[in-house]
Regions:
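C-terminal output helix
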Residues: 89, 107-117
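Receiver (REC) domain active-site loop signature in two-component systems and cognate sites
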Residues: 56
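Active-site beta3 strand of CheY-like receiver
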Residues: 45-51
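Conserved Asp/Asn-Gly motif in the active-site loop of CheY-like receiver
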Residues: 32-36, 109
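Two-component/phosphorelay signaling modules centered on CheY-like receiver
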Residues: 12-30
Length: 125
């Protein structure tokens, strides 16, 4: 199965690199550097997973996760928080806002497709 992912990160460089690596690995990817155009693509495209950076200027990933959990149409979409913050901090935030998982950016891009594939398999099936 080809998983559909929405990537959200305010760093265009990080976003482009993640999107490229994941697309090369067979994921369908929609990448967004701003939350302004976020809602309609999510509702229309029905992604299997949302991967969002934790620290962003408009609305951080934790706030986005909480907002998505309150919406009927998005409350069941798995959400992964992604950050270069220490694992303990990232894990605590993910638990507190109802994220399904967290990923450290420090692990590098090479491991990203396998980790997200495993998460999709575990969360969705």
């Amino acid at each position: 199965m080809k998983y559909r992912l929405v990537l959200i990160d305010d760093s265009q460089t990080a976003l482009d690199m993640m999107a490229h690596v994941l697309a090369e690995a067979g994921f369908e990817v929609r990448a967004m550097s701003s939350l302004r155009r976020f809602v309609n693509p999510v509702l229309d495209w029905k992604p299997h997973l949302i991967v969002t950076d934790l620290y962003m200027p408009e609305m951080n990933g934790a706030e986005l996760c909480q907002w998505l959990r309150r919406q009927v149409t998005t409350s069941r979409i798995p959400i992964v928080l992604c950050s270069s913050a220490p694992d303990e901090e990232l894990a605590a935030v993910a638990r507190s806002v109802g994220a399904d998982a967290y990923l450290s950016k420090l692990a590098g891009l090479d491991a990203l497709p396998e980790r997200l594939n495993t998460l999709c398999d575990e969360i969705l099936w």
